[in-house]
């Protein structure tokens, strides 16, 4: 169902916010779906107005002490009919039992958690964009209107 949607919202808090931006960019580049990356705390400041039945909402989440707020935001999207895709560690997945689809990443209980989690989550983000694009029939090897390099003049 995600592959036929016209839009998608991608959310995350703190260190994973750049991953939400990159995940949304990959969806745009190869599947031609309008997607936006947002910090989870910003959802009520506009993006929630776009959520309706079957709109995919993707969240990257790790158990870092702030996950309850993010899961609450995700629950609000779910209550408005969004299709929830959660890429998270087991602790977060266990708390968000309402998610339609989950991808579990390894958990880290050390000082490297914030550094390693974005690396692990980038793989499912890229695979999601790839499979959505393939489902839509787009050419993932030669996306339209993209240049391999940017020249600054």
Where is each model-derived feature located?
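Active-site-proximal loop->helix
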Residues: 46-56
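Long, compositionally biased charged/polar accessory segments in the mid-to-C-terminal portions
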Residues: 14-16, 70
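A general structural motif
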Residues: 35-45
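Single conserved hydrophobic/aromatic residue that forms the stacking wall/gate
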Residues: 1-7, 11
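Short, structured coil segments at secondary-structure junctions
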Residues: 6, 31, 53, 80, ...
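Short alpha-helices
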Residues: 14, 99-153
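Glycine-rich phosphate-binding loops that contact phosphosugars or nucleotide phosphates
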Residues: 60-108, 128, 136
